[in-house]
Amino acid sequence: MKTDLLACRHIGVNKADAEVMLRKIGVASLDELIDKTIPANIRLKAPLALPAPMTEYEFARHIAELAGKNKLFTTYIGMGWYNTITPAVIQRNVFENPVWYTSYTPYQTEVSQGRLEALMNFQTAVCDLTAMPLANCSLLDEATAAAEAVTMMYGLRSRNQQKAGANVVFIDENIFPQTLAVITTRAIPQDIEIRTGKFRDLEFTDDLFACVLQYPNANGNAEDYREFTEKAHTANCKVAVAADILSLALLTPPGEWGADIVFGTTQRLGTPMFYGGPSAGYFATRDEYKRNMPGRIIGWSKDKYGKLCYRMALQTREQHIKREKATSNICTAQALLATMAGFYTVYHGQEGIRNIASRIHSITVFLEKSISKLGFKQVNKQYFDTLRFILPDSVSAQQIRTIALSKEVNLRYFDNGDVGLSIDETTDVAAANILLSIFAIAAGKDFQKVDDIPEATIISEELKRQTPYLTHEVFSKYHTETEMMRYIKRLDRKDISLAQSMISLGSCTMKLNAAAEMLPLSCAEFMCMHPLVPEDQAAGYRELIHNLSEELKVITGFAGVSLQPNSGAAGEYAGLRTIRAYLESIGQGHRNKVLIPASAHGTNPASAIQAGFTTVTCACDEHGNVDMDDLRAKAEENKDDLAALMITYPSTHGIFETEIVEICQIIHACGAQVYMDGANMNAQVGLTNPGFIGADVCHLNLHKTFASPHGGGGPGVGPICVAEHLVPFLPGHGLFGNSQNEVSAAPFGSAGILPITYGYIRMMGAEGLTMATKTAILNANYLAACLKDTYGIVYRGANGFVGHEMILECRKVYEETGISENDIAKRLMDYGYHAPTLSFPVHGTLMIEPTESESLSELDNFVLTMLTIWNEIQEVKNGEADKEDNVLINAPHPEYEVVSDQWEHCYTREKAAYPIESVRENKFWVNVARVDNTLGDRKLLPTCYGCFD
């Protein structure tokens, strides 16, 4: 392999290191290890047919060429996407900072205080702007937030409504079309009927349980919904409102006129359009609905010494605990983008946000008055940033389109011939003059250029916001770049990311996110593209999307790909909806059961329920495999109604099951489909694939296998790949003329981060990707060999090897000493490591996945850490350490505790803080001691204003 290829930088183990590791494992070669790990009958016979790998320099030139094919016109299409200004201090110190983008979802509270605080800022900003008491820390986008709102309101129906079968949701006709489409996809399998029309004409019938409104609406008109909301509540109907978050700086917020749920996108709070995504959806509601709310919620708590801290609250609602009974299948959301939006509000504060909104509104008012003087009729009576014009008889929309394109401007063109425009943060006087000139030329009239646009408003007193927002001190302290930079740095020092050390989370694949893959995201031609521009303006994006889709087909062995799902859970849902659509097309729509192994990730049953299926659990045997007898029995018992099997491969137990082909055959013999969860695809690439094994559909986690970063809990991409017979049923998009099974607002989902995976595949090539897979398996087996004689490995494959991850036995330790897997996880923090995956898929264990990116020296340091912790456990077992006062149950040890004048433990400060030599050179200090989880759930405080009595 050439030394200037990415594979040499991405893969952490060199040839000499591998030989040392193979000797420890007990095999003669890497090929022998792979042959003994992966069943021979599923091994690919030929290398992946992918383009030759590019060097980093060659890829930089190639991606620049693609970017150059994108034409950056000034776009006023709106419809949920707006140009914005990302403050450089946020772009440089957050968006482009690996400390922020390589961190994991903040389950481990003590090593996540920085991003938890940043997400708390986001929640507070959302609550303030919407005037609601509770918000989560992001959803995937506005459209999926709308679908979640409808599902939540359906679950909140009164007992009488449920008995009466109330199943109708009213959606105002002036909602964004992509939002209606995604709601429709979600509603159909849940037997929710959608009724659309004008909100003023609605008759509140007994079968109605909820209403969804847009504010301002899709035309840009800001309606006064107060009377309607009162009527809805009188009729026992909930009201959800899709609100433009920036408009709420000027408009009366929905929380003040009775909304039950307020949702939308925070894209215009400093997040580029990225050809549709990613951006952080938001979701706010009433406090009494907190246990019904989808998504993650950050709340206050205290550590064991009483220090205030943050944590993820009310996790018992979520899929990883409640599984099929969860409030939602949401897992990965948009944490990095929510963090950026939160910092945007912190940086600008109340005055800055109001000034931005007022400037946008003033320019809109100026344009309405000026264009109306040219003979155009503007239809919106109350508006924030959007105008819709009826054209005079002498002017056609095509004339305006031609003139606009000649000036490199995109406007919105309605089906009836009207023309619209939405002003944004980047619009200045010069841009306003160009817009005015387009309409003047079309009308054949002169116009007067202006040098300044005065502040103005047309918002009525009834709709004008009177209440303050962003009043917490965090929104007023950091308005200089110096202070903002230091604040961001203070927060990132509190967190463990890949910039600190290996993150060995099983089933999460925390691999390198190479700088060469990340750089294109900061390119304006990729950042500033609206998803609904004419196709020729997005030629570079379209070529990249086509190339990436073809490469994913090759890697998975499938015939079709959809890049639309915004997360792995969204991919599961999309794949199951695709299966359902196919079954309905062949007269098998009655099939409504999905078989799921007991070891499956919680998103599997949650997604199946969301897609309208019921779940049947299949047992696993003592070796961690699917119990074949139970599988056959369950498949036979349910064969007439069986729609699919959902199975992860290699399994969540970390092994390649030898009967996987037979498993697929059993399911197909019942007339059902095989859904392969691609969470563990990092152990397949180049060696086997779902299509070759016999699956019909799989989703991929680009933020796992394909090098896109986790971002502290998103963004992710969960594309689905399908066999030939399922291709016609893949998600489409109504705005592109193919409305079916839409699962996200944008046609290509989070298109803005696709260059990462594209770069990974293009620079690794077939040989590099295959070597990455082999090395991931090598690294996992090396750790297993090093730790098997102490902790023990719960499951191994047929020949005694693990796949790319392993489950470490901790249950016996607990029985003998009272030291739990959680204590071990917390103690790892003192050594500078993030915890592995706790108690999944087996309670009382740790699941470890090292990935191919880690070097032998890092693996050895982790082994030394785990063995030192093992010795600490033995000290407790042998009575050398106090069972009630030892380094494990007291872990982690924050700096403030170690340097305190009060030290009452029976072990030394040095043992607590510097247990091995490497820690002295690279000490990570947790910011808080062990956090009180019960307190944080007992009293949920989801904003910066919260405090404990």
From Swiss-Prot:
InterPro entries found in the cross-reference section: GcvP, GDC-P_C, GDC-P_N, GDC_P, PyrdxlP-dep_Trfase, PyrdxlP-dep_Trfase_major, PyrdxlP-dep_Trfase_small
GO molecular function annotations of the record: glycine binding; glycine dehydrogenase (decarboxylating) activity; pyridoxal phosphate binding
Keywords per UniProt: Oxidoreductase, Pyridoxal phosphate
Modified residues (N6-(pyridoxal phosphate)lysine): K704
SUPFAM superfamilies recorded: PLP-dependent transferases (SSF53383)
Function recorded in the entry: The glycine cleavage system catalyzes the degradation of glycine. The P protein binds the alpha-amino group of glycine through its pyridoxal phosphate cofactor; CO(2) is released and the remaining methylamine moiety is then transferred to the lipoamide cofactor of the H protein.
Subunit description: The glycine cleavage system is composed of four proteins: P, T, L and H.
Family per similarity comment: Belongs to the GcvP family.
Protein name: Glycine dehydrogenase (decarboxylating)
Organism listed in the record: Bacteroides fragilis (strain YCH46)
Classification lineage: Bacteria, Pseudomonadati, Bacteroidota, Bacteroidia, Bacteroidales
